[in-house]
């Protein structure tokens, strides 16, 4: 008997919980030799939700690109999860009874992939997010959900058995805050978890130069990527309700760019996009960057040693490019493999591990 699907309604930031989950599930289905998250696949199939008609225009468009076999932006968290899994497993191999804290957990399912049968796991997120998590993922044994802001030190008191080791993971969260807030966060960790470790990801300043994202590819490949984006955009447009189309049109109208669409119908948008130069596309991306930190973040980090200057109690254990040691599996498209190589070589996206 087929289990009834769970219908949930989300909007805004909370909607991204589902997209990161969807990314892990999709990568698991398409590239299981690289990464497999059985719980994410199970959960994604359990939820009654149409990802292609997101209220957030970028996400609906990008998800359609993923379905067409192009580089999936929401596949990146899955590859990050693979790197985090390896780090968590290495730590609990040395500290089998450790407490592991998943900061800004969302609908993350790391516990199910790394559990050794004796760790205690904590999933920390805002109350509204934890409420959704409890609905979809009830707390398993040795797991505690904490409904608090990551900046509120009160949650630190909920972490028990710290003498057995504390390991924290913060995937895809710190870049969305101001540097002053990130400094406060690390100081709080050093106050409460001396000797603990944390792993997190952050983009470099180079990541802000959106025009350069396509410069590493040959002209023919850049053209193919543009065609794929238009096709994904059109697919989203045909399914999206009018209020979502209006939201995107308003966003485009607010951009300070030399050209704008002449109308609000699909033909107007397609004609506008196809006549844009590479420079204009770069300006458009920078305009989106300026208007929406929700997508592109605020805080960047070039070198983890910068954090040790904030607080002498903090030491660098490791820092490496996001895709380092991830196999360039032949099942991945050439575009994805080239993107991984370029990202690592340029240092755009990195993973950092610190001792507090």
Where would I find each of the regions flagged by the language model?
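Core SAM-dependent methyltransferase catalytic element
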Residues: 332-356
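A short, conserved alpha-helix within the catalytic core of class I
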Residues: 176-189
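Rossmann-like AdoMet
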Residues: 1-101, 107-148, 162
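Conserved beta-strand signature within the Rossmann-like core of class I S-adenosyl-L-methionine
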Residues: 192-205, 271, 275
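A conserved beta-strand element that flanks and buttresses the S-adenosyl-L-methionine
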Residues: 168-169
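Short amphipathic alpha-helix with an adjacent loop that forms part of the alpha/beta core around
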Residues: 154-163
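Conserved class I S-adenosyl-L-methionine
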Residues: 199-221, 282-286
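Short alpha-helix
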Residues: 294-324
């Amino acid at each position: 008997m087929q289990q009834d699907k769970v219908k949930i309604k989300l909007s805004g930031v909370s909607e991204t919980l589902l997209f990161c989950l969807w990314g892990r599930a999709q990568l698991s289905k398409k590239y299981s030799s690289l990464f497999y998250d059985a719980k994410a696949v199970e959960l994604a199939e359990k939820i009654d939700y149409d990802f292609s008609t997101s209220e957030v225009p970028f996400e609906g468009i990008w998800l359609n690109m993923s379905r067409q076999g192009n580089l999936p932006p929401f596949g990146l968290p899955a590859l990050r999860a693979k790197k985090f899994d390896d780090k968590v497993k290495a730590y609990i191999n040395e500290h089998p009874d450790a407490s592991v804290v998943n900061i800004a957990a969302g609908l993350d399912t790391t516990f199910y992939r790394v559990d050794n049968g004796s760790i205690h796991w904590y999933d920390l997120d805002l109350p509204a997010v934890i409420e959704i998590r409890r609905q979809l993922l009830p707390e398993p044994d040795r797991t505690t959900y904490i409904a608090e802001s990551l900046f509120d030190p009160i949650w630190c008191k909920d972490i028990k058995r710290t003498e057995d080791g504390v390991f924290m993971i913060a995937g895809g969260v710190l870049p969305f805050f101001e540097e002053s807030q990130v400094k406060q966060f690390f100081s709080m960790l050093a106050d409460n978890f001396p000797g603990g470790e944390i792993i997190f990801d952050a983009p470099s300043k180079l990541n802000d130069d959106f025009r350069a994202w396509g410069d590493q590819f040959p002209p023919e490949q850049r053209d193919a990527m543009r065609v794929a984006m238009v096709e994904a955009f059109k697919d989203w447009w045909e399914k999206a309700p009018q209020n979502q189309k209006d939201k995107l049109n308003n966003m485009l109208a607010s951009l300070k760019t030399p050209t704008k669409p002449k109308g609000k119908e699909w033909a107007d948008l397609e004609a506008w996009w196809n006549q844009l130069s590479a420079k204009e596309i770069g300006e458009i991306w920078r305009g989106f960057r300026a208007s929406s930190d929700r997508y592109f973040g605020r805080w960047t980090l070039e070198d983890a040693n910068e954090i040790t200057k904030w607080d002498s109690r903090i030491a660098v254990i490791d820092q490496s490019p996001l895709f380092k040691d991830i196999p360039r599996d032949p099942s991945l498209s050439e575009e994805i493999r080239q993107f991984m190589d370029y990202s690592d070589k340029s240092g755009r996206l990195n993973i950092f591990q610190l001792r507090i």
